[in-house]
């Protein structure tokens, strides 16, 4: 990923990237995105962009493994996150879903992960401490709650499922208040141009609709241009 593409991705929202991927692929039907409504800790922040660092957690019940095993895995998890190639995004599956109760993402964990250089986090689980999270580290979560429960790390680095989206370690993630998606590797090289094409195509309708004397006849004309230009 080039610095120019990274800057482009941070400037646009996730729906724009969804559409731009289809422009790059030349067809409709891109489906590697989350389903349902997600919550964002900082909806006005730029989009979360980076390569996935994955893990699984649980919190409903106390861990059944020995405490030393849990502690060792916790340190392995933090080491794994600290060594992430940047830009990176923590993508964490709560295996208690849809009955998640343990907020893994609060003031402490967001501050730690931001300190490691990560750009944000995506989870099907719970977040909390919304007024105390550090600036510049958005979290996109399925829900908000007060407790951490018995939260503990179950697995590190394996493929995870986030609200219908399968994410593997190293996948390129784009996420914001609308949800998250995985950018296919085969469009990374053409995605920057696809974003520009999409935005210019949308302006055909938007610019006309914002002018005075916009009427149905004008709409028909610009919509025909729009249809010919879009994917």
Please state what every model-predicted region is.
Residues 21, 113, 171-173:
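Buried hydrophobic positions in well-ordered alpha/beta secondary-structure cores of metabolic enzymes
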Residues 4-13, 193-195, 223-231:
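Long, charged alpha-helical interface segments
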Residues 31-33, 91-93, 121-125, 139-141, ...:
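General beta-strand structural signal in soluble alpha/beta enzymes
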Residues 144-217:
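Acidic, glycine-rich flexible loop/linker segments
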Residues 1-71, 75-84, 206-214, 220:
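Intrinsically disordered, low-complexity regions enriched in acidic/Ser/Thr/Pro/Gln residues
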Residues 79-126:
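Extracellular/luminal Protease-associated
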Residues 128-144:
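Histidine/lysine/aspartate-rich catalytic loop segments that bind and position anionic ligands
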